[in-house]
């Protein structure tokens, strides 16, 4: 399993979908799982930029993992967002015949993120919500990278600026190296 880390608008979804299309992998996005959820509490939190609580997030992810063949490479996007989720993931992946092969961190300047998110047109992509989501990402999610590194999980940083194809070439190379380690 490859974990995608990066702030909203860094291109994780686009690159995840390309890896699926070109390699036959499975892309799991907690954001996509949440947006397709019927739970009104999830939609309320999405609209305000708040994180979904760990218990509900873990449940949604656990159910999604049950539906994927353990031999299929999975790209996990948007999870874990905090150290408790990282611990839960490391503890529960073996139940699904999986482990974390590596983490790929997408890096994009904040001005570019604001432009991308404003152009994207999702309901939650208004400036106030974008700023809140970026602040939450830096405050809560970034320390997870340090925790995963402390657990011996390889982490690679990738410049996610440029054309979709340029970024994809970088991501493809790093992802391929991760799973062959």
Each model region followed by its residue ranges:
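Glycine-rich phosphate-binding loop of ATP-dependent small-molecule kinases
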Residues: 1-181
């Amino acid at each position: 399993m490859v974990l995608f880390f990066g702030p909203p608008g860094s291109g994780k979804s686009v690159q995840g979908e390309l890896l699926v299309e070109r390699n036959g992998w499975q892309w799991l996005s907690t954001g996509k799982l949440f947006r397709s959820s019927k739970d009104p509490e999830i939609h309320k939190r999405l609209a305000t930029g708040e994180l979904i609580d760990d218990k509900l997030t873990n449940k949604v992810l656990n159910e999604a993992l049950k539906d994927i063949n353990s031999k299929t490479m999975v790209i996990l996007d948007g999870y874990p967002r905090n150290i408790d989720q990282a611990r839960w993931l490391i503890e529960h992946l073996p139940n699904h015949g999986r482990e974390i092969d590596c983490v790929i961190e997408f890096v994009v300047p904040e001005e570019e993120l604001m432009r991308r998110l404003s152009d994207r047109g999702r309901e939650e992509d208004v400036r106030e919500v974008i700023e809140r989501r970026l602040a939450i990402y830096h405050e809560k999610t970034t320390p997870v990278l340090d925790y995963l590194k402390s657990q011996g999980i390889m982490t690679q940083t990738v410049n996610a600026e440029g054309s979709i194809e340029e970024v994809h070439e970088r991501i493809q190379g790093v992802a391929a190296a991760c799973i062959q380690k």
